[in-house]
């Protein structure tokens, strides 16, 4: 049975993850620190290099670089599934990202499209924050 609390939690969770990708459009990088938990438990895997497991500080730096390097950024979240376990939640979905990868030094750009999957783990402390991100490409 889904209670009203679970409905508002679900809405909050999807909004936080959408905010993560909206940063690619708005370039408001300060939001990255608002929606991700600055904690030693934070971790992430990316769909672009480097592929190793990253901590909070490294993740933020690479996310900032990624979002400022892609102009005309857009994304689509498909088939989201949210599972809530008390004060933690998992959001898994299919993800399409596209834009123009810009090389400011060479004044060139390359259109990119990344089809992939994403899993976000969030922790309610006291509001929902991202504690883990796993992005992976699907080679088509």
Walk through the language-model features, giving the residues of each.
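Short, low-complexity N-terminal intrinsically disordered segments enriched in polar/charged residues
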Residues: 1-35
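A mature extracytoplasmic/lumenal domain signature
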Residues: 36, 94-97, 134
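Short, cysteine-centered beta-strand-loop-beta hairpins and adjacent loop/turn segments enriched
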Residues: 68-69, 98-111
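Short beta-strand edge/turn micro-motifs at domain boundaries
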Residues: 90, 110-140
């Amino acid at each position: 049975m889904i209670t009203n609390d679970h409905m508002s939690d679900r809405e909050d969770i999807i909004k936080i993850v959408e905010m993560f990708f909206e940063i690619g459009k708005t370039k408001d990088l300060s939001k990255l620190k608002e929606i991700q938990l600055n904690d030693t438990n934070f971790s992430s895997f990316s769909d672009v290099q480097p592929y190793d497991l990253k901590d909070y500080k490294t993740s933020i730096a690479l996310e900032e670089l990624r979002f400022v390097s892609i102009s005309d950024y857009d994304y689509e979240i498909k088939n989201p599934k949210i599972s809530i376990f008390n004060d933690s939640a998992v959001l898994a979905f299919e993800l399409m990202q596209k834009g123009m990868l810009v090389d400011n030094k060479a004044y060139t750009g390359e259109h990119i499209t990344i089809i992939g999957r994403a899993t976000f783990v969030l922790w309610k402390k006291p509001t929902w924050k991202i504690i883990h991100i796993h992005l992976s490409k699907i080679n088509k």
